[in-house]
Regions:
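Periplasmic polypeptide-binding modules associated with outer-membrane biogenesis and secretion
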Residues: 1-50, 56-264
């Protein structure tokens, strides 16, 4: 590689020869291969500057102009993908490269000009359920909590992070009470780029409902204080619907007792 070639020596006619660099070569080696200037609205410019894969090659000082030109082709696709996560699916991009011989920072500058276009807005949201939660009258409040607490509303801007957060937030509410093994069985963000609209749908599969069973202990872990001490501290309500907060409170009581090194 280049570093090995520069650091090695060759023997010719019994003489030890080392490569000689000019002052210009030394200056070039100390500079980055290129700098990146993203010209876009501030929030978009900051996001692209931080996440563009092109940044990984910036400090390769021996990168040639031809190699950088090839990288710019991939950078265009990467920038469009990143803009899509912010809800901009029809942007206009222009990528330019120019030499910067007078710069002490980089040998070249890559200028990325972005016209993001309209941000996609959420048009509608469909939240469905499958499994026992779907028809169980006693689960009505839980269904309403998931639907009513949904964090993305029609008219809001679509972002991938917001979409992921909304889906996961609904699943957490599903898992906290009665259905700890519930999952997202279907989710779709159907984006109409021309209309700048997103149609969201998600289905939560509750899985079976759980109740607290009799407390069981492992003998080798309860030799000192015994099963009864654990039962009195935990106070788990046998036969009651599973409730994550009740479980966490039991764990906290056991941990705070000082009897055990760890509780999980």
């Amino acid at each position: 590689d280049a570093a090995a070639a520069e650091g090695s020596a060759a023997v010719t006619s019994g003489a030890l020869l080392a490569p000689v660099r000019s002052g210009a070569d030394d200056k070039a080696a100390q500079r980055d291969a290129f700098s990146i200037d993203v010209q876009a609205p501030p929030n978009i410019a900051d996001y692209l500057t931080r996440h563009l894969e092109l940044q990984r090659f910036r400090e390769l000082s021996d990168l040639t102009a031809t190699e950088l030109s090839r990288l710019l082709g991939a950078a265009d696709a990467n920038a469009r993908e990143l803009l899509g996560t912010l809800g901009y699916f029809s942007p206009t991009l222009q990528l330019e490269m120019r030499e910067t011989p007078g710069s002490s920072v980089a040998q070249r500058e890559v200028i990325i000009t972005v016209e993001p276009g309209r941000q996609t807005r959420i048009s509608d949201v469909s939240i469905d359920f499958s499994g026992p939660i779907q028809y169980d009258p006693s689960a009505e409040a839980q269904r309403e909590d998931i639907v009513g607490g949904w964090s993305l509303r029609p008219g809001q801007g679509f972002t991938q992070s917001g979409w992921d957060s909304a889906k996961n937030g609904g699943q957490r509410k599903l898992n906290r009470l009665r259905f700890p093994t519930g999952t997202i069985s279907h989710s779709l963000a159907d984006v109409d780029a021309d209309a700048a609209e997103a149609h969201l749908s998600v289905t939560y599969d509750s899985g079976p409902a759980f109740r607290f069973g009799p407390l069981q202990t492992v003998p080798e872990n309860t030799q000192r204080y015994g099963h009864e001490a654990v039962r009195l501290l935990a106070r788990l309500p046998t036969g009651a619907d599973y409730d994550e907060s009740v479980m966490l409170q039991a764990q906290q009581r056991l941990a705070s007792s000082g009897y055990y090194d760890s509780v999980f």
